[in-house]
Structures are given as C-alpha cells and as structure tokens.
C-alpha cells in the first residue's frame, strides 16, 4: 500500500510514471542525513509534548535499525517516490501506523529534503576543502626544494621572463587558496536550517525550530518558511565554486600535459598516471591529466543545468528541484576524485632542472630587465628603453647573434653608456629573479616568505575545517545513539 497516494489519488500508479519521477537512484546521498533529520525531529516533537515518550522511543529505535540495515536493503519501490517515504514505509511496517505515522507530524517532505541536502552537502564541502589543503601543503613542500630552480615564465605561451619553479608552483597555491576560501564561505550559507518551514507555511503545532537546529548542528535558521523550502542558491553557490575550482585544476592538468611533452621536456609524469599506445610502443601518454581535464568540464555543464532548472520556477517548492540533485552530486564526486588525481600527479612528478634552466636562458627572456637597467642607469623613459631593447632583439635575430654582441652598438647609436657588468647582470636570468624581491615576486627570499605565509594560513584553514567536521561527527554520534 502506498501510504502517500492512498487518500487523494488511490494506490495505483503506472510503473513507467513511478520510474520516471522517482529520485531513489540519487537519494542514497541523503539517506544518512534523512535518518538524522528524522531523529532530531522526533526528539523535538517529544520534548514539545506533541508525541508521547513511548512512541518517540520506538520511532527513534526503529530509525536506528533502518540506518544499520542500510538503504540498499530497504524496499526501494519507485512508487514510493523518494527515500523519505521509503524510510517512513519501512518504519510503519515495523511499528504500525499508529506509532510510526506520528513521525511526520508538523513537517513536510519539502522542509525535510531541504534540510537533508544541507546536512549532506556541508560535509562534502569540508571534505573537498580538506583535500585541497593537503594538496597545497604538498605543493609547498615541492616548492621548498625548487626556490632556485630557474624556469621561463610564459605569456601567450611565448617566453616572457625568468622565474623559478617554486614561484610557478606558488601560483597554483595562490589560486586554489581562494577556492578553499570560497568553499568555507559557502559553508556559512549551507549550514542554515530550513527544518520546521513545513510545506511552505510552517505548522500549527508548537514546534521548536531552535532545538532541531541545535540537534543537527546548524549555525542558524532560515527565517522565512517560503524561502526555506524553495532556496537552492546554496547548491548553485557550491556548484559555482566547484566549477571555478575545476577551471584551476584543469589549468594544472593542461600544464602537466604541455610541460611533459618532448618539446618542453621540463617535467615527467609518473608512470602510474600514464598509458601507452596499442600500436606505438614508444608512447607514454598523459591519460589521467587528459581525462581529468575533460571530466572537469562537466562542472560547468552541471552548474548551467542547475541554473536553468531554477531560472523560471515560481516561489516555494516545485518538483523540478529534485532534478538538480544528480548534477550536484556529480560535481561533488568529480571534484573529489579529480583532486586525488591531480594531487598524486604533482606529488610524483620528476623535474628536469637542466632543461628548465636551458629554456630560462633562451629566447630573450631577460629583455625586460635589460630595458629596466637602461632606465635606471641612463634616466631615459621606459618607453624609449623598450624601443631600444626591441631593436636589440630584432637585430640579434636578424644577425643571428647574442644580445650581448649587439647591445653596445645600439647603445652607441643612441649615445648611451652603461657599465658592462650592469649589462651582463641584466642579461643573467638568475640575477633577474633575485632582483624581483617585491611581495609576490620570484626572488628566492621572497618565495621563502610566501611559503611560510601560505603554510600558516593553510594551518588555520585546516583547523577550521577539522573543528567543523568534529562538530558534524559529534551530531551523528549523539543522534545515532540517542535514547529517550
């Protein structure tokens, strides 16, 4: 018997309709959250005198048994719609409707699912943040070893200026730190309780929303019941944050692919993250980085899908909201899995220092510092110096000479004199790097300072994440062992 349909609609529902509309295939993500939500709600109903002690006790014990049994062992009949009704039906089979039928007093599936989603998502957001923190800490360890390893920096994928490999790695840390901060900020808006908002107008029962908020470990209440059941902006925000993170991770994957090619040859990806060809025996293909780059594209698509589902819905609850969930969880698990892959690749890459230095010294990457030196030593405007050095580069290319062989002729043409040692220093890539010691620059001493600062901040973020996870785990422990 379908306990939901029997009154207004009768028991019958076409099998294909039930399969089309059910959410059970992705409700596994909120099974635990739903049990926690049920227990907290029943505790509150008892404390408020809305249901009897003996009924509350039986319901809570029944919910614990269902939790231990596991969702996979329940009757997942599509005609029951969703996990909420599966659990309630299971409870009614165990305890009878006179007892179990009281669990849903003063509550709707609308506020229930909104609560479940927040409970499930908040933990996933923290897990993602923690995995990013661990990855960044390992990147900092790698950077520590390469503060003086010269590489060329690129703009437009053309040689730009010499930097260090550590400085390049810190660009990843700097970007992904913002991803961590976005996730921690989103957590504030995820961890707000809609429980008690009912279908959309709360309830006439004298429930205590503050109590369920406390029991479930929420930080605040949604203070409008219509907004409480309809709000999915916390999902959009999380999916947007993951899409931005995915863009940053994809950039890392692209550079791993690019720099591991024969033409660049500055790094080598570990064998366990590569494949070979079925026909070309010499091949070592960066398959994991390529697949990660592709999978991360889904995060953008999932976000756009969710935005499109929500864009024209009338206020409060609509069943359309259900269809956001699979896209949310796909984004979440794609992110979790990809972080693991990117972390593994970065942790195990081999560095070709000689090739890095060779590229750093090639193709006029020190031209900017040469122009800066002319400004400092002669007092000419930078734009004038820019033109002079551009002429030096052009002539060097045309005459197939090094810049040092051309610079003095060009300086003489413009009646300029610069000490030879100053010119040599300007053309030395390592001296270029050492001079750039402003905050955020590639100088080894400055990079060391940034490593220290990043470590300190990551330690703070990790402490915050751990405290939140401990609170969540404490909520689970208390509710799943609660006795009246």
UniProtKB/Swiss-Prot annotation:
GO cellular component: cytosol
Protein name: Argininosuccinate lyase
Family the UniProt entry places it in: Belongs to the lyase 1 family. Argininosuccinate lyase subfamily.
Reactions catalysed according to its record: 2-(N(omega)-L-arginino)succinate = fumarate + L-arginine
Matching HAMAP family: Arg_succ_lyase
Keyword Protease belongs to the record: no
A single GO BP: arginine biosynthetic process via ornithine
SUPFAM superfamilies per record: L-aspartase-like (SSF48557)
Main location as per UniProt: cytoplasm
InterPro entries documented for this protein: Arg_succ_lyase_C, Argininosuccinate_lyase, Fumarase/histidase_N, Fumarate_lyase_fam, Fumarate_lyase_N, L-Aspartase-like
Pfam families: ASL_C2 (PF14698), Lyase_1 (PF00206)
Biological pathway: Amino-acid biosynthesis; L-arginine biosynthesis; L-arginine from L-ornithine and carbamoyl phosphate: step 3/3
Subcellular location: Cytoplasm
Keywords on record: Amino-acid biosynthesis, Arginine biosynthesis, Cytoplasm, Lyase
Membrane spanning stretches: none
EC number: 4.3.2.1
Any one GO MF annotation of this record: argininosuccinate lyase activity
CDD domains, per database record: Argininosuccinate_lyase
């Amino acid at each position: 018997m379908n306990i939901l349909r029997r009154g207004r609609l009768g028991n019958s529902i076409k099998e294909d309709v039930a399969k089309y509309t059910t959410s059970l295939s992705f409700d596994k993500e909120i099974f635990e959250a739903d049990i926690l939500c049920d227990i907290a709600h029943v505790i509150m109903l008892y404390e408020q005198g809305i249901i009897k002690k003996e009924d509350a006790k039986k319901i809570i014990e029944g919910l614990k048994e269902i939790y231990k049994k596991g969702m996979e062992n329940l009757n997942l009949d599509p005609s029951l719609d969703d996990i909420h009704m599966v659990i309630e039906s299971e409870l009614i089979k165990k305890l009878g409707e006179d007892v179990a039928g009281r669990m849903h007093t003063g509550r709707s599936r609308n506020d229930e699912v909104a609560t479940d989603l927040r409970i499930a998502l908040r933990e996933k957001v923290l897990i993602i943040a923690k995995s990013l923190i661990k990855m960044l800490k390992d990147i900092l360890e790698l950077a520590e070893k390469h503060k003086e390893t010269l590489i060329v920096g690129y703009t437009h994928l053309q040689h730009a200026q010499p930097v260090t490999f550590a400085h390049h790695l810190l660009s990843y840390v700097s970007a992904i730190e913002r991803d961590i901060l976005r996730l921690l900020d989103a957590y504030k808006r995820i961890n707000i309780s809609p429980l008690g908002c009912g279908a959309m107008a709360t309830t006439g029962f004298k429930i205590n929303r503050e109590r369920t908020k406390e029991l479930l470990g929420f930080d605040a209440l949604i203070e409008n019941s219509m907004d409480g059941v309809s709000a999915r902006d916390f999902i959009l925000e999380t999916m947007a944050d993951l899409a931005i993170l995915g863009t940053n991770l994809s950039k890392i994957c692209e550079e791993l692919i690019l720099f591991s090619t024969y033409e660049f040859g500055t790094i080598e990806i570990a064998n366990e993250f590569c494949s070979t060809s079925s026909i070309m025996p010499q091949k070592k293909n960066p398959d994991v980085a390529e697949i990660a780059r592709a999978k991360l594209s889904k995060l953008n698509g999932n976000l756009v899908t969710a935005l499109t589902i929500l864009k024209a819905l009338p206020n409060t609850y609509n069943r359309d909201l259900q269809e956001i969930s699979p896209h949310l969880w796909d984004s979440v698990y794609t992110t979790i899995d990809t972080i693991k892959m990117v972390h593994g690749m970065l942790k195990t890459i081999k560095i070709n220092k000689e090739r890095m230095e060779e590229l750093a010294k090639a193709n006029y990457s020190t031209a900017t510092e040469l122009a800066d030196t002319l400004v400092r030593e002669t007092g000419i405007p930078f734009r004038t110096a820019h033109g002079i050095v551009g002429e030096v580069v052009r002539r060097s290319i045309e005459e197939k000479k090094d810049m040092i062989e051309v610079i003095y002729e060009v300086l003489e043409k413009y009646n300029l004199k610069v000490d030879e040692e100053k010119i040599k220093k300007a053309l030395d890539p390592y001296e270029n790097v050492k001079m750039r010691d402003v905050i955020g620059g590639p100088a080894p001493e400055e990079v060391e300072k940034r490593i220290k600062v990043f470590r300190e901040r990551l330690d703070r973020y990790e402490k915050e994440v751990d405290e939140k996870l401990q609170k969540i785990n404490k909520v689970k422990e208390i509710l799943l062992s609660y006795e009246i």
